[in-house]
Amino acid sequence: MSNHAEASVAPVEAYEPPYYVAVFTAVRTQDQSGYSETNARMEVLVKDVPGFLGMDHAQSPGGLSITVGYFRDADALTEWRCNAEHRAAQKRGQEEWYQSYTLHVAKVERSHGFTRAQAAQSPTAG
């Protein structure tokens, strides 16, 4: 049995609402030339946007990728959407890297999280 506690994978924290999320779901094409480099650049660039809170990313074995960006307010989200390098990456994505994608933007009104304690959990004899 694998021990998931050893992995460095964790969701972003539950931020204080309200805040905004941009949920990007995509299926990529076979040709991914330049994708990794551009994606890495976007991950660095978005961190410079005032109001950027964090990002989660997951990919299914079937090829669906999901990226969730968290932003403090609509202005931060707009700044990212209008960034010239980001716009160029979006254009290239439509031309080369994505078979299909969907973007959902929402205002988060409620948020909470859970983290299991690091101490071993064992049932109490009873």
Please place each PLM-identified region on the residue numbering.
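Short S/T/G/P-rich N-terminal loop/turn motif that feeds into the first structured element of a domain
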Residues: 1-64, 75-82, 98-126
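Conserved RNP beta-strands of RNA recognition motif
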Residues: 67-73
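Amphipathic alpha-helical interface segments used for dimerization/assembly
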Residues: 81, 89-90
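Short, conserved catalytic or adaptor-binding loops enriched in Gly and charged residues
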Residues: 93-96
